[in-house]
């Protein structure tokens, strides 16, 4: 019998992974006491502290400055809603007032309320703002006794409500109508028109 011998034999080298010690394997399977204690600490942290940690992670070293701020009236209404409906959450209130839940949390946390002197200052400030708005739109027309601006050929566009918590003034912000972009008659055409009209007048007088 003839046995065929292969011309080229490929040799494969098998890499052997080093055997890891038993302690390392145990570490991967079972967490250490320190890891367990850290996890238990995290679980035992109260909700208010978790909230502070999450806010610090989001903001970092920056100062708290929300893009939208609620007025004094809106802040009071937030507090009133929370007192009336204890089960209402911060997220629900934030959706209602279009602010972040963190802003609602800070409003409910703070106990500051303005006294009579501060209320007077706020009212004066809003009065000054109202006067400024009246001056701004005084050029467009006259302002009636009820605080509304009366202007000819103008259309009401927006409404600005100025409130100090106790008094409220409403001003209509008004803008002019946009002129239509129709093609204007040229000077030559106008002259020809005038000539034709003159000729017609002359012919009418002759008759």
From Swiss-Prot:
Any Pfam family hit: Neugrin
InterPro entries linked to this entry: NGRN/Rrg9
Keywords recorded for this protein, A-Z: Mitochondrion, Transit peptide
Disulfide bonds: none
Subcellular location: Mitochondrion
GO cellular component: mitochondrion; nucleus
Keyword match Calcium: no
Residues of the transit peptide: 1-12
GO biological process, one term: mitochondrial genome maintenance
Major subcellular location class: mitochondrion
Top-level taxon in the UniProt lineage: Eukaryota
Known function: Required for respiratory activity and maintenance and expression of the mitochondrial genome.
Protein name per Swiss-Prot or TrEMBL: Required for respiratory growth protein 9, mitochondrial
Organism: Candida glabrata (strain ATCC 2001 / BCRC 20586 / JCM 3761 / NBRC 0622 / NRRL Y-65 / CBS 138) (Yeast)
Top-level taxonomy: Eukaryota, Fungi, Dikarya, Ascomycota, Saccharomycotina
């Amino acid at each position: 019998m003839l046995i065929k011998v292969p011309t080229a034999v490929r040799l494969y080298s098998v890499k052997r992974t080093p055997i890891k010690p038993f302690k390392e394997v145990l570490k991967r399977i079972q967490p250490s006491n320190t890891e367990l204690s850290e996890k238990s600490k995290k679980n035992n942290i109260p909700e208010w502290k978790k909230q502070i940690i999450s806010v610090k992670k989001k903001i970092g070293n920056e100062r708290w400055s929300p893009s939208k701020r609620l007025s004094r009236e809106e802040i009071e209404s937030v507090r009133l809603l929370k007192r009336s409906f204890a089960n209402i959450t911060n997220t629900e209130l934030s959706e209602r007032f279009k602010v972040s839940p963190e802003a609602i949390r800070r409003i409910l946390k703070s106990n500051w309320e303005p006294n009579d002197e501060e209320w007077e200052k706020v009212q004066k400030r809003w009065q000054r703002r109202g006067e400024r708005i009246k001056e701004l739109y005084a050029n467009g027309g006259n302002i009636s006794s009820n605080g509304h601006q009366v202007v000819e050929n103008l259309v009401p566009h927006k409404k600005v409500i100025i409130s100090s918590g106790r008094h409220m003034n409403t001003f209509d912000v008004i803008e002019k109508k946009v002129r239509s972009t129709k093609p204007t008659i040229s000077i030559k055409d106008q002259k020809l028109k005038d000539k034709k009209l003159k000729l017609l007048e002359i012919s009418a007088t002759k008759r």
